[in-house]
Amino acid sequence: MNTYTVKASDIKRDWHVIDASGRVLGEVAAEAAKYLMGKHKPMFCRNLDCGDYVVIVNAKKITVTGNKLDQKMYYRHSGFPGGFRQEKLGDLLKTKPLFVIEHAVKGMIPRNTLGAQILAKLKVYEGAEHPHASQTGVVSKES
């Protein structure tokens, strides 16, 4: 019996909507990464982008466990002397909740050119409204 090799023309992409209200950041990011990479499909192939589109709604209502709101720090550097900046997770969730979710999902995606294609299929929105209502057919029920 021969091994079946997936071709790019065989890949069918679905749209998954994940409601993040009241859910933990890591759980939402892990679920989104699974759908984005296509690991939930029986024809998963590492060298092809066989994942689905993911829409995450209610990003402002996401929760974290423990003392992460006060203790978890996000770092960046501008490249100039004295350009080191750091922000707490609690402050970022108030100002840029989309960045927090995108950053968490990005950490769970492969760090190569295929990872950039995979991450392009992620759509995150602060509220419950999103412009992809006509494409979405699958609503995630995992919690």
UniProtKB/Swiss-Prot annotation:
Q: Which UniProt keywords apply?
A: Ribonucleoprotein, Ribosomal protein
Which SUPFAM superfamilies does the UniProt record give? Ribosomal protein L13 (SSF52161)
A cellular component term from Gene Ontology for this protein is: cytosolic large ribosomal subunit
Gene3D superfamilies named in the record: Ribosomal protein L13 (3.90.1180.10)
PROSITE patterns to which the protein is assigned, alphabetical: RIBOSOMAL_L13
Q: List all membrane-crossing ranges.
A: none
| One Pfam assignment | Ribosomal_L13
Give any single GO term for biological process.
negative regulation of translation
| Gene Ontology MF term list | mRNA binding; structural constituent of ribosome
Q: Which PANTHER family would you find in this protein's record?
A: LARGE RIBOSOMAL SUBUNIT PROTEIN UL13M (PTHR11545:SF2), RIBOSOMAL PROTEIN L13 (PTHR11545)
Q: What job does this protein perform?
A: This protein is one of the early assembly proteins of the 50S ribosomal subunit, although it is not seen to bind rRNA by itself. It is important during the early stages of 50S assembly.
Q: What is the annotated quaternary arrangement, including any partners?
A: Part of the 50S ribosomal subunit.
User: What family does this chain come from, according to its entry?
Assistant: Belongs to the universal ribosomal protein uL13 family.
The name under which this protein is listed is Large ribosomal subunit protein uL13
Q: What is the lineage of its organism?
A: Bacteria, Bacillati, Chloroflexota, Dehalococcoidia, Dehalococcoidales
Which gene does this sequence derive from? rplM
